[in-house]
Amino acid sequence: MAEKKARFLAETGEFEYISPYNDYDIIAGQGTIGFELLEQLPNIDNIYISMGGGGLISGIGSVIKYHSPTTKIIGVSAINSGALAASIKLGSVCETAHFDTLADGCAGGIDEGTLTLPIATEVTDSVIECTEEQIVEAIKILVWNENLMVEGSAALALAGFMQEKQSKKHERNLVLLCGGNFDKNKILSILN
């Protein structure tokens, strides 16, 4: 919705539209997180990253793969809005059905000719898709066990990790929790 409004305002000529993902500067900015991760935790086996338009996974994945090529990048997508996940599997931009998702920061399609698809395809080792129920469970785990209140898009990464937790229990796993734009009423209804 915000992206639509931004595009509309840009069409008036008074504003410039900057994509939240389809821009080299945005991708590079997201990549700085990769440098921070490597500085603080240099021996990570797997990194779970929520996927929307692909800016975050492209930026972080590029830095990680360059400096730590054995680290696996696992993209996590909401089943209700999985255009990037489907496009990575297909190898080209494809449109998918979009339904409401708690991971609304990751919702929506990707632009034809997007910069992120070839980058994300190259740096992503695997993709996990999550249901809304799995995202709800991840939000609850973060609130009750970690005392963290994050948006659904951040909890999406944990929901993906939870699917592989047992098989990766002897590895060094990092779940990227990036995003605190939560609707308090929505979170409260999940917790009740």
Predicted regions span which residues?
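PLP-dependent amino-acid enzyme catalytic core
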Residues: M1-N192
